From Swiss-Prot:
Versatile oxidoreductase that catalyzes the oxidation and reduction of a broad range of substrates. Preferentially oxidizes secondary alcohols. Has highest activity for racemic 2-octanol. Is also an efficient reductase for selected substrates. Substrate selectivity was found for medium chain lipophilic ketones. Has highest activities for 2-octanone, 2-nonanone and 2-decanone. The enzyme is (S)-selective in the reduction direction and produces exclusively the (S)-enantiomer. Zn(2+) 1 binds at C47, H70, C157. InterPro entries: ADH-like_C, ADH-like_N, ADH_Zn_CS, GroES-like_sf, NAD(P)-bd_dom_sf, PKS_ER. It comes from Yarrowia lipolytica (strain CLIB 122 / E 150) (Yeast). This is Alcohol dehydrogenase 2. Its cofactor is Zn(2+). Optimum pH is 9.5 for the oxidation reaction, and 6.5 for the reduction reaction. The gene is ADH2. NAD(+) binds at G181, A182, G183, G184, G185, L186, G187, D205, K210, V272, G273, L274, R344. Belongs to the zinc-containing alcohol dehydrogenase family.
Amino acid sequence: MSAPVIPKTQKGVIFETSGGPLMYKDIPVPVPADDEILVNVKFSGVCHTDLHAWKGDWPLDTKLPLVGGHEGAGVVVAKGKNVDTFEIGDYAGIKWINKACYTCEFCQVAAEPNCPNATMSGYTHDGSFQQYATANAVQAAHIPKNCDLAEIAPILCAGITVYKALKTAAILAGQWVAVTGAGGGLGTLAVQYAKAMGYRVLAIDTGADKEKMCKDLGAEVFIDFAKTKDLVKDVQEATKGGPHAVINVSVSEFAVNQSIEYVRTLGTVVLVGLPAGAVCKSPIFQQVARSIQIKGSYVGNRADSQEAIEFFSRGLVKSPIIIIGLSELEKVYKLMEEGKIAGRYVLDTSK
């Protein structure tokens, strides 16, 4: 294969200050380091984390100026001299974890998302809201050629994240799992992964469009939190005692704390969504007496990533996506803040 022609400049969305103007403009194409690949990003999903990165409202500093995005799917067009795991023309994915140290106590047990020296795409390393982006070749995801690059983009964060959360819940096939925020980008994927893993799914969200989507994707029960008079009672009745696990992907502190009330005795509450400044509160007596576990789950490691991608490549999981141009990113953030997104927005970097 002849070497692709790589331009000196590209289109991207960049901001210079937290919460500052989102500028769609010409920016330089990065040069891959010795251990990196350069990916011609065709499509990028938009995650709630990207909104936080722009606002700068997490207790973790971003680099500035910053190109956000960490769900980038594209084609390898260049690679550093030490890279032997990718070839030019391969499909590759840019994930949240861009690079880890691979030597700390966490990396040694394959918990590289917890590496204190990790760099994050679209946060501390320029991400996928540009036409060309770099990623460490060890962390970059290998995407099978049978995959649609637009549809697989959300799998690279949302899919991996909810798949890992379901593994963290450690429940058995046939048991109940509740998903809060089930109609959003993470939630719609959580419903599908849970179904594919053999669980019975109860979806919690609001709105007729989200109810239809969740049920079409495999949810057995949908509870509209805005309509129910007693959500805790309704959830426990529908699952005959409460779900064995709850996957909290909503960005609601109230939803998190409410899930501790309705989860089944001996059940597990998994925290995934990160509402700014939120606190998880659990009555200690009830948590001890009912033997409830509360666990955090933070993206996934390389094995989790490839497993999540395999579910997609086998057709067991689909991405309910809406494709718009990269230049329209600010519109997506506005809809995200208003809670009006069903499924996932994906940006076409050519527009």
